[in-house]
Regions:
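Alpha4 helix (beta4-alpha4-beta5 surface) of REC/receiver domains from two-component response regulators
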Residues: 68, 72, 76, 92-117, ...
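Two-component/phosphorelay signaling modules centered on CheY-like receiver
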Residues: 16-34
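Acidic, metal-coordinating helix/loop segments flanking the phosphotransfer/catalytic sites
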Residues: 10, 23, 34-53, 61
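Non-catalytic signal-transmission and effector/linker regions of two-component phosphorelay proteins
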Residues: 1-10, 16, 40, 119-135
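A generic structural signal for alpha->beta connector loops
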Residues: 6, 30-32, 83, 109-112
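Conserved phosphotransfer cores of two-component systems
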Residues: 47-49, 76-84
Length: 135
C-alpha cells in the first residue's frame, strides 16, 4: 500500500453512487483520487493534476441509450496525456464496445489497458494494480 500513496487516479462516472463507491475503494487502498461527473470536468482535472490512471465509465450520459462518451473521453486522454493508463468500466458492455476499447485504432493506439463490467468490480483493485505495474 505504501506505493499507492504516490499514485493519483481519476474516476469519471455520471452516477454519484458509483463515483462514491469507486473512489472510496481506491482511497481505502491509499490512492490519491479525484472524481469527475462529466468529460468536461475530467478534462479540467487533467489540466490541474498529473494522473497515473483514469477509471472511466463508458456511458457518461445515463439517459442516452448507446451513449459511449467514455470511449470518446479515453481517446482525448490518449491524445493529450499519453502516459495516463486507462481502465474502462460499464454496466452496459457489448462485444462491439469491448472491441472498440481493446483493439488498436488507425494510429495503432489502444484506448484502454483493461475493460471491466460493473458487475465484476470485486476484481477492480487487482486489475488497477496490474495496469499500474505495466511499463
Amino acid at each position: 500500500m505504501a506505493d499507492n500513496k504516490q499514485r493519483r487516479i481519476l474516476v469519471v462516472d455520471d452516477i454519484e453512487d458509483w463515483r462514491t463507491t469507486l473512489s472510496g475503494l481506491l482511497l481505502d487502498e491509499g490512492y490519491k483520487v479525484e472524481v469527475a461527473d462529466s468529460p468536461a470536468s475530467a478534462l479540467a482535472l487533467l489540466d490541474t493534476y498529473t494522473f497515473d490512471l483514469a477509471l472511466l465509465d463508458v456511458r457518461l450520459i445515463e439517459s442516452e441509450d448507446g451513449n459511449t462518451e467514455g470511449l470518446t473521453l479515453a481517446s482525448k486522454i490518449r491524445e493529450i496525456r499519453p502516459g495516463v493508463k486507462i481502465v474502462l468500466i460499464t454496466g452496459y458492455d457489448t462485444p462491439e464496445m469491448v472491441r472498440q476499447a481493446r483493439e488498436p485504432d488507425a494510429n495503432g493506439l489502444i484506448l484502454a489497458e483493461d475493460f471491466i463490467p460493473k458487475y465484476k468490480t470485486a476484481s477492480l483493485l487487482q486489475i488497477i494494480e496490474e495496469v499500474l505495474a505495466q511499463e
